[in-house]
Curated annotation (Swiss-Prot):
PANTHER family (UniProt xref): UDP-3-O-ACYLGLUCOSAMINE N-ACYLTRANSFERASE, UDP-3-O-ACYLGLUCOSAMINE N-ACYLTRANSFERASE 1, MITOCHONDRIAL-RELATED
Keyword Cell wall biogenesis/degradation (UniProt): no
Paired cysteines (S-S): none
Enzyme class: transferase
The protein's name in its UniProt record: UDP-3-O-acylglucosamine N-acyltransferase
Assigned protein family: Belongs to the transferase hexapeptide repeat family. LpxD subfamily.
Active site per the UniProt annotation: 252
Catalysed reactions, as listed in the record: a UDP-3-O-[(3R)-3-hydroxyacyl]-alpha-D-glucosamine + a (3R)-hydroxyacyl-[ACP] = a UDP-2-N,3-O-bis[(3R)-3-hydroxyacyl]-alpha-D-glucosamine + holo-[ACP] + H(+)
Origin organism lineage: Bacteria, Pseudomonadati, Pseudomonadota, Betaproteobacteria, Burkholderiales
InterPro entries for this protein: Hexapep, Hexapep_transf_CS, LpxD, Trimer_LpxA-like_sf, UDP_GlcNAc_AcTrfase_non-rep
GO CC terms of this entry: membrane
Species this protein is from: Polynucleobacter necessarius subsp. necessarius (strain STIR1)
């Protein structure tokens, strides 16, 4: 078990207090025990932190000052890891402890896997049961592909990427290093492209061949049952470090920048470009052919129908979307709309009665 001193050095935190024992992992404030670490990154949980039984807390300097001045009824002897960003330090420490419990996929190929003779599969890879790997596929070192996943022809998957069961990766897809793709994801299906050919008596929708690729950069995580369509003629691109939640739809020719986060059930229409470091809430949706500036935040269920050109703005609203501050003001007015209506009726009644 790592000691407090070892953890403080590894995660560049200042250590306050002494712990005679090591730590087994992390836990929530209300459940943590003396051999576990918890964290405080929200003022609302200060009192709960003061009463926690955790043997160590990751805190900011201001939170440490509060906790030392308000020890709480529990009065547990604990140590503090003082960090500039407690939440980020918690995340990195959680990664550290999780590695000890992560399943290790031993290298080797399950006998039920079907691998084309032209595919390149290094000996360090793990290929699970009933996996299909097509012609011309190239896998990097230590790639793990779990059961029932399918990798179609000429796709390239770089080293240390993990693909969970029942993932479908279509042809010519490019996936970078250290990516994680969860079950049910479909990468590289045809984009939704059809041209109308109608007359007064009938017609049809003419399918446009989708000849582009999906290109996924390094350190991307893609949630369960998310779908990313291949480009029509150019590529659909996901930037490095971007994290995509479950059941997200990304249409053809979309470009998502680096280090974005996209929450569940969001939908991005074709040819829209999302900047770097954007935050997209759950079930937010974007019209096609838009450009979204860097560091834009879009609240959940918000509809974006116009490009956003100024970086760092926060948009909220079903229709129309607007700056978050303006939406809050309008929402407050909307809550009092019935009272305003009653007052106007009374004023109108008094006016008509001459009083």
């Amino acid at each position: 078990m790592p000691t407090a001193i070892e953890l403080a050095e590894q995660f560049q935190a200042s250590l306050v207090g002494e712990a005679p024992h090591g730590f087994t992992g992390l836990a929530p404030l209300e459940r943590a025990q003396s051999n576990q670490i918890s964290f405080l990154s929200n003022l609302l949980y200060r009192q709960q932190a003061s009463e926690s039984a955790a043997g160590a807390l990751i805190v900011s300097q201001s939170d440490l000052d509060f906790l030392q001045a308000n020890p709480g009824a529990n009065s547990v002897k604990r140590v503090y890891f003082v960090a500039k960003n407690p939440y980020t330090t918690f995340a990195r420490m959680a990664q550290y402890f999780a590695k000890a419990n992560d399943p290790i996929y031993a290298s080797g190929i399950h006998p039920s896997a079907v691998i084309d003779s032209t595919a390149i599969v290094p000996p360090s890879c793990h290929i699970g049961p009933f996996v299909q790997i097509g012609a011309g596929v190239k896998l990097g070192e230590r790639v793990s592909i779990l059961g029932n996943s399918s990798i179609a022809k000429d796709s390239v998957i770089a080293s240390d990427t993990l693909i969970y069961p029942s993932v479908s990766i279509y042809h010519n897809t490019q996936i970078g290093e250290r990516c994680i793709i969860h079950s049910g994801a479909v990468i590289g299906a045809d984009g939704f492209g059809f041209a109308p050919d109608f007359s007064a008596t009938g017609g049809e929708w003419v399918k446009i061949p989708q000849t582009g690729r999906v290109v996924i950069s390094n350190d991307v995580e893609i949630g369960a049952s998310t779908t990313i369509d291949r480009g029509a003629m150019s590529d659909t691109v996901i930037g490095a470090g971007t994290k995509i939640d479950n059941q997200v739809q990304i249409a053809h020719n979309v470009i998502v920048g680096s280090c974005c986060v996209i929450a569940g059930c969001a939908a991005i229409s074709g040819s829209t470009k999302i900047g770097n470091f954007c935050i997209i809430g759950g079930a937010a949706n974007f019209a096609g052919h838009l450009t979204i500036a860097d560091r834009t935040t879009v609240s959940g269920n918000t509809s974006i129908i116009r490009s956003i050109t100024e970086p760092g703005q926060h948009f909220t609203g079903v229709y129309p979307s607007m700056l978050h501050g303006a939406w809050e003001k309008n929402a407050a007015i909307l809550r009092g709309l019935d009272k305003i209506r009653q007052r106007l009726r009374l004023l109108d009644k008094n006016k008509n009665s001459g009083s």
